[in-house]
Amino acid sequence: MVIVWEAVGATILPNIGGWLSTPLTIKSVKGWYKTLARPSWTPPDYVFGPVWTCLYTGMGFASYLVWRDGGGFSGEAKTALTLYGAQLAINWAWSPIFFGLHKIGAGLVIAVSLWGTAGAAALAMSRVNQTAGLLMVPYMMWLTLANTISFYLWRNNPPRKDKKKE
């Protein structure tokens, strides 16, 4: 069996941001987040870790397929991988802003930006490798749910007087 280290690295890379934000997220979920008015259709807290691990793994492998089939970081893959990197950076920014700083409004802006950038990345990736585009579909569906939750949280949790305005 031959291990394709590029595939392994690309698959692990997006998970790193999730792993790094886990302590901050857990602390906030056990405290501040529990005080928020949340929609009844919000998935249970224990679902988020496994779902994000699957989504990060799928998008990471999708990026490998694009890199492999699109000629590396130049040529056909350049736009798709640039958009992928941009959406990954936006994704990683959300947890510290939302869970760390408790900025619901800024979290919503980031979530909407992420949805648009990830959608553009998914389309660009599908032009290079159709399977890569399909691997991004569950992520886009989850981001759609996340955006509706973010909007609900923003609408139903006004800034607190003891906190800076969002």
Segment roles from a protein language model:
Residues 1-24:
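N-terminal signal-anchor transmembrane alpha helix
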Residues 15-19, 56-62, 88-91, 117-121, ...:
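Helical transmembrane-bundle signal
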Residues 25-44, 160-166:
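Cytosolic, membrane-interface loops and tails of multi-pass inner-membrane proteins
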Residues 45-57, 102-114:
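Membrane-interface loop-to-helix entry segments
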Residues 57, 61-95, 99:
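Helix-adjacent hinge/juxtasegments
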Residues 81-94, 107-121, 136-144:
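Hydrophobic alpha-helical segments of small multi-pass membrane proteins
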Residues 96-105, 126-130:
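Membrane-interface helix caps and helix-loop-helix hairpins in membrane proteins
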Residues 126-166:
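Terminal transmembrane helical module of multi-pass membrane proteins
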